[in-house]
UniProtKB/Swiss-Prot annotation:
It is found in: Cell membrane. InterPro entries: NALCN_aux_factor_1/2. Coiled coil: none annotated. The lineage of its organism: Eukaryota, Metazoa, Chordata, Craniata, Vertebrata. The gene is NALF1. Glycans are attached at N217. Residues 70-155 are annotated as: Disordered. It comes from Homo sapiens (Human). Belongs to the NALF family. Residues 75-96 have a biased composition (Low complexity). This is NALCN channel auxiliary factor 1. Keywords: Cell membrane, Disulfide bond, Glycoprotein, Membrane, Transmembrane, Transmembrane helix.
Length: 458
């Protein structure tokens, strides 16, 4: 009865019914809010699912492209190895033919003279010296060119030495003196030769009459690893390795001791060996930490290795190179390495950072370059030549690169996936916070209505 009276009084007082609405009317409003939240969450999940699938497909395509590139590179390496094996076989066959004891007699019976006799005849008939002139001149004399044309492929044994010196197929650097190129392996076999004194000796004819064996040229002997440096350049520029006196006057001294020459050549070989060790360490670091070979649009690991080798050899042998088509200051190779080699980040190999390079040149701008600075052959110019002529080293072809998108995708797939997961977590947090705020607002609204009802009742 009390309830009926209250309801009547509520109706008589003219109060609106929605102030004391039943709970059944609140349920559709709450259901619509929940449905809207579910729609937002499902839409966001669908969007990020599509985004993740797109990135996964992108990464899979990049991996397939990279696998194809690796197969192509392996095929190229196999072809290069086969070519090297064929060249080694040809060299071994040439060595076997020249090691036969009866080949001079056979040549004499066929009406041809031995290579030593031909070289001696050319030297006696030529009026130009066999030693290359000063670095400012272009090359050797005419007799040198004739000797390179006649004896190319024959003089593997130096004089009467029983130990052969390995002969290079092509001469490095470009524009070599005579076309005859040898690597320095045995210091005794090299120092036992009769070296040409060139224009320094005024009694050239007397020397030729006293020594029937041919005079060898220092510019025809190269180091094994730093194969762009000749003995002529080393004896001319680096005259004191390991506190030794290795000047040209000492080496070319007639009747001098062979001990000094051998010690100098062995010192140069030690420097060359240390440079090769440092290069192998750098190559192992590249192989270990460099994920993708296509790290740049303008450069590749082969370009980096070429300029790094040139810079490394220029640090061990600070001499000027003579037989080059174009020379640059040797210190400039440091900048080439800095710009062509990649940024190596051992701490995190998945994320690409911008900033300083892993190879930084120091001390280049402190001292100005003068004319006394040594100059080296420009390998940047030589590596661009696609058709190497005789007397040059055969360079590898251009780097096989894929597109920038594919090359960058192989390194950014994992980081993008992590970024998408992080965005999903943040979205879930935002939705949860908004839902909590809405529920709090509804509860506060209910409390306000109850308070209003209580005041109305009073």
């Amino acid at each position: 009865m009390t309830r009926g009276a209250w309801m009547c009084r509520q109706y008589d007082d003219g109060l609106k019914i929605w102030l004391a609405a039943p709970r059944e009317n609140e349920k559709p409003f709450i259901d619509s809010e929940r449905a809207q939240k579910w729609r937002l969450s499902l839409a966001s999940l669908l969007f990020f699912t599509v985004l993740l699938s797109d990135h996964l497909w992108f990464c899979a395509e990049a991996k397939l492209t990279r696998a194809r590139d690796k197969e192509h590179q392996q095929q190229q390496r196999q072809q290069q190895q086969q070519q090297q094996q064929q060249r080694q076989r040809q060299q071994q066959q040439q060595q076997r033919r020249q090691q036969e004891p009866s080949w001079p007699a056979l040549l004499a019976s066929m009406g041809e003279s031995s290579p030593a006799a031909q070289a001696h005849r050319l030297l006696s008939a030529s009026s130009s010296p066999t030693l290359p002139p000063s670095p400012g001149d272009g090359g050797g004399g005419g007799g040198k060119g004739n000797r390179g044309k006649d004896d190319r492929g024959k003089a593997l044994f130096l004089g009467n030495s029983a130990k052969p010196v390995w002969r290079l197929e092509t001469c490095y650097p470009q524009g070599a003196s005579s076309g005859q190129c040898f690597t320095v392996e045995n210091a005794d076999a090299v120092c036992a030769r009769n070296w040409s004194r060139g224009a320094a000796g005024g009694d050239g004819q007397e020397v030729r009459s006293k020594h029937p064996t041919p005079l060898w040229n220092l510019s025809d002997f190269y180091l094994s690893f730093c194969n762009s440096y000749t003995l002529w350049e080393l004896f001319s520029g680096l005259s004191s390795p390991n506190t030794l006196n290795c000047s040209l006057d000492v080496v070319l001294k007639e009747g001098g001791e062979m001990t000094t020459c051998r010690q100098c050549v062995e010192a140069y070989q030690d420097y060359d060996h240390h440079a090769q060790e440092k290069y192998e360490e750098f190559e192992s670091v590249l192989h270990k930490y460099l994920q993708s070979e296509e790290y740049s649009v303008k450069s590749c690991p082969e370009d980096c290795k070429i300029v790094y080798k040139a810079w490394l050899c220029s640090q061990y042998f600070e001499v000027t190179q003579f037989n080059c088509r174009k020379t640059i200051p040797c210190k400039q190779y440091c900048l080439e390495v800095q710009t062509r080699c990649p940024f190596i980040l051992p701490d995190n190999d998945e994320v690409i950072y911008g900033g300083l390079s892993s190879f930084i040149c120091t001390g280049l701008y402190e001292t100005f370059l003068t004319n006394d600075e040594p100059e080296c052959c420009d390998v940047r110019r030589e590596e661009k030549s696609n058709n190497p002529s005789k007397g040059t080293v055969e360079k590898s072809g251009s780097c096989h690169r894929t597109s920038l998108t594919v090359s960058s995708a192989t390194r950014l797939c994992n980081s993008r996936l992590k970024l998408c997961v992080l965005v999903l977590i943040l979205l879930h947090t935002v939705l949860t916070a908004s839902a909590a705020q809405n529920t709090a607002g509804l509860s506060f609204g209910g409390i306000n209505t109850l308070e209003e009802n209580s005041t109305n009742e009073e």
